[in-house]
Amino acid sequence: MTETPDVAQTRNRVATHLVGREHELELILSAVAAGRDLVLEGPPGTGKTTLLRAIAEEWGIPLFYVEGNADLTPAKLVGHHNPARVLKEDYSEDNFVPGPLLEAMQQGGFLYLEEFNRAPDDTLNTLLAALAERRITVPRAGSVTAVPTFRLIASMNPYDNVGTTRLSTSITDRLCRLAVDYQDEAAEIGIVNLRTDKGGALGELLVKDAVWVNRATRRHPDLRQGSSVRGAIDIVLVANQLAAMRGVAEAADSTTRLDAESAYPKLVLDAMTVALSGRIHLDEASDTTAERVVKEIWEDRFILSPAAAQPG
């Protein structure tokens, strides 16, 4: 990657690997090509990592992943001296083991810090010099100046505030920000089709059902956070395996699909339970269970909605 990449050509090439996200792709490209660091704010499973990986591959630069949590100390982020060698040789540059921040700076890569606001304050403060000066000094190891293509890309989940840290103005003032929300239904159907060979043996009708029930988790009143599109993908994959075991050859024409007692709807309920019950997060004030919520959503799709559509 050069310091002034052709962002139009990059956008066109990267877009061929994505379903939707053209607008977000343009904004991310514009920010990183302008030399800016960036925080992406959105729930898991919205394509943030896919976008960054595609851009990094297109530009031929490495992508370093770090998970933000209470265990991410400054030493784990920046690096540390090898204790065994220190005992023999004392502290020196030779026995310093660089962490992902220094590796990204030295190699001109993207440092992707997930769950940015879960990292401790002292760890986040170590980023200030890298963000402001593109240079960091490590005691007894010297200074590292970032290669021009180095960028910090952070991510945050706005739907989950448990165990998070309020970011200081000194950090947020040095970052651009982009909200990345769930995609629309058509885009999610396209993603699931792509990842499941158009629904496999059960066909595209299963894909539509899976996407519908999965999206319904995001608006259920008892849930603090619903499932990403990964839930719909897993519904389809699990349902196809169940169908093979149970001898359900296809998903159905309109008659059997609307009959909640037929094999296909029951199969979808079982697949939903496996795929969604661990992905959805109950509201703290809720007195229900994940399995009950899944069953309610299934009933909305296969019992209540078809009944409402019946004439008379």
Where are the regions that the model predicts?
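AAA+ P-loop NTPase catalytic core and its hallmark functional loops
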Residues: 1-208, 311-312
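Short, conserved alpha-helical segments within structured domains
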Residues: 47-48, 206, 227-231, 264, ...
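Phosphate/oxyanion-binding loops and surfaces in catalytic or ligand/nucleic-acid-binding neighborhoods
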Residues: 84, 239-242, 274-279
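Short flexible/disordered coil segments
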Residues: 127, 131-134, 214, 218, ...
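Short acidic/histidine-centered micro-motifs embedded in hydrophobic/aromatic stretches
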Residues: 130, 209-213, 271
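A general alpha-helix detector
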Residues: 174, 187-191, 216, 234-238, ...
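C-terminal engagement/docking regions of AAA+ P-loop ATPases
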Residues: 249-312
